[in-house]
């Protein structure tokens, strides 16, 4: 009986070391990207970010194109409520700008806060869920990691202030084929 308990403890401890305390429910991707064999997406693309699975998926006119591992704000994957809560917002957005970034290689900004974000924010204020003087925040987007820290993505370590972070090579690929105006859905 002692050996079963010891084995279980070692197994649990090892999994926490490898995956961290907040690994995604679907770890089958092992933080690798997957994509169709075609070299680039066909026609209009859209992006779906699944916070529970730690995945950013790209769809084009043929359907699914690619999936990349990503991480978010704080370890709690709840919806963003206000500025400073380190949460990644949920909802429907668009890419509004693209630029080279001095820290994170590239930055694809989304239109947070948009009308949907403001409606949720004001409803939360009205219900007293957030302070009356809270602000909604902004400057949310998709970006890379700190230089030489792509391993953070492999370990599913949430570290941003609310943005979506991905490995440098994956980000450069996404940046190359994603136009301004692209639809981005972020869900839990």
Each model region followed by its residue ranges:
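Exported/periplasmic cell-wall-interacting domains
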Residues: 99-188
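Well-ordered beta-strand positions in beta-sheet-rich domains
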Residues: 46, 67-69, 92, 139, ...
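Short Gly/aromatic-enriched secondary-structure transition segments
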Residues: 63-75
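N-terminal post-signal-peptidase region of extra-cytosolic proteins
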Residues: 31-46, 51-52, 72-97, 124-128, ...
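Bacterial Sec-dependent signal peptides at the C-terminal "C-region" and cleavage site
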Residues: 12-29
């Amino acid at each position: 009986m002692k050996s079963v308990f010891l084995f279980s403890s070692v197994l649990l401890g090892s999994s926490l070391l490898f995956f961290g305390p907040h690994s995604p429910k679907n770890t089958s991707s092992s933080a690798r990207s997957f994509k169709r064999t075609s070299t680039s997406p066909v026609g209009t693309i859209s992006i779906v970010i699944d916070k529970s699975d730690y995945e950013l998926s790209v769809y084009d006119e043929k359907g699914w194109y690619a999936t990349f591992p990503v991480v978010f704000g704080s370890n709690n994957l709840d919806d963003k409520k206000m500025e400073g809560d380190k949460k990644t917002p949920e909802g429907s957005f668009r890419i509004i700008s693209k630029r080279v970034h001095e820290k994170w290689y590239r930055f694809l900004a989304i239109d947070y806060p948009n009308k949907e974000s403001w409606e949720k924010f004001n409803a939360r204020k009205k219900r007293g869920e957030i302070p009356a003087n809270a602000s909604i925040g902004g400057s949310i987007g998709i970006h890379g990691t700190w230089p030489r820290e792509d391993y953070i993505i492999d370990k599913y370590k949430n570290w941003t202030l609310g943005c979506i972070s991905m490995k440098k090579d994956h980000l450069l690929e996404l940046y190359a084929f994603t136009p301004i105006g692209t639809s981005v859905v972020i869900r839990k």
